[in-house]
Amino acid sequence: MKRMSASRFALLLLMVIVASTGSVSALAQDSAGSFRERLRARMAQKGGSDAAGEIVNPAGKITQPGNYRFTLEHDGIERTYLVHVPAKYQPGHPAPLLVAMHGGGGSMEYQASDDNYGQISKSDREGFIVVFPNGISPLKSGLLATWNAGTCCGPARDRNIDDVGFIRKMIDKLSQQVDIDRQKIFATGMSNGGLMAIRLACDLSDVFKAVASVAGTDNTTHCNPTRPVSVLFIHARNDDHVPFEGGRGKTRRQEAVTSFTSVPESVSRWVKRNGCGPEPKRVLDKPGAYCDR
């Protein structure tokens, strides 16, 4: 990999789940299709988050660990997000920030559920703040929400919702209430949320140090990052919703999705953008999964 400078160093990783014969992660244990079905089943059983005892729209600085719910207006639309401030947080000591985005048809509550992703528990162990924004939803409950990640997905794309502007505004507002290390802001997401994480790497490269996309490829319509951003793609070979080799996956509403960019093409784009060397290095190789850097 080509090194530019310590401040401009960027990393590109591709983790591929090649089969369901072994595991190095939860995703490796099932095919992508069955994994999504399990997520839908859980969503049907429970829609709440683990953010018990939320404080809604607190004014001023946040000084105590806990769970917080916020609303803000952007482009004339009321947007919502959940914030978890970890037990290790100390005012005056800037903490890293993770923006975690739900998949298409999901919600911030579902993404925040520790039963589903464990991000709140991880936040408490590692000491980073995690924020769960909600996409655009046709329902007051915020369920069935989508992100405008470029060519996907659903109502957010069709209405050309400014999700990039919302995320920037959310981070700016949050940084006024908690002490965030602006050099350690990261994004991750599942499926449509993963696609959105990649768009943030393109459009908010001045904000994000690194992004990780699970089951989401690069479906941006334009991408001109002002600096390298480390990118991680985690994808199943047999994903039948966002196919590894690109194209349309299985869905009940074809018009809600797109012809997805393949994983190899997505990786190739970021190799060029980040000035990485053309030959990948295998850094993980286990039954069922491998990772190239």
Place the predicted regions along the sequence by residue.
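Bacterial N-terminal signal peptides
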Residues: 10-21
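Bacterial N-terminal signal peptides that target proteins for export
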Residues: 2-12
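A domain-start/cap signature at the N-terminus of enzymes
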Residues: 27-97, 112-115, 128, 188-212, ...
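Short beta-strand/loop motif that positions the catalytic acidic residue
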Residues: 233-235, 239
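Short, proline-enriched alpha-helix->beta-strand connector loops that line the catalytic pocket
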Residues: 226-231, 265
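Short, glycine-/aromatic-enriched active-site segment of Class I SAM-dependent methyltransferases
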Residues: 246-253
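Serine-hydrolase catalytic machinery in alpha/beta-hydrolase-like enzymes
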Residues: 67, 71-85, 92-186, 196-199, ...
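Conserved alpha/beta-hydrolase "acid-adjacent" motif
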Residues: 241-245, 259-262
